[in-house]
Amino acid sequence: MLTQKQLVQILGNPESYNIEITTSTTNMDKFCQAICAFSNDLPGDDKSGYLIIGAEDNGKLSGLRVDDGLLLKMTNIRTDGNILPQPVMTVERFVLEGGDLLVVEVKPSEFPPVRYRGRIWVRIGPRKSIASEAEEKILMERRISNIRTFDAMPCIGTTLANIDINP
C-alpha cells in the first residue's frame, strides 16, 4: 500500500493508466469498473492500480470523512460476485488536512481477463473502457501463459527417495 507521502505526490499529478481519482462516494459501478480494469493490467507491467476517493482531478481534497460504512461498502466489492475472478485488493483510509482519502489498491490478476458483470474493462491511459476483441485476446493469452500444466508443477514434500526409477 502507498505511504501518505507517496499519496500526496500522486495527488499532484494527473490520472494515469494505474491511478483513478474521484470525489464520488456513491457510484459503485464506476468503482467496480475501475477495479476490474486495474485487475486486468492491459499494459502487463505488473503494477498495482489505485482508486483514490475523496479528491478532485487537480488533487484538491473534497473534505470527505470516511466512515465504517464507506469502508465496508468498498471492501464488499471484492466478494459480492460482480467481479470475477475476485480481485486482489486492499482498502485503507488516510486522514489528511482538508479531509480523508479512501485508497483502494488493486493488484494485477494472475488469471485475466477479469470481468465486471460479464464485461471486460481495461484502462487505456487515464480512461477506462470495455475491451476490444484484440485486447481480450491479449488478456486470454496472458491467462494461458500463467497456467502451468501438471507436469510443470512442483511436487512439494517429495525427495529423491520418492522417485521410482525401476519400471
What name fits each language-model region?
Residues 1-167:
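Conserved N-terminal catalytic/coupling substructures associated with nucleotide/phosphate chemistry
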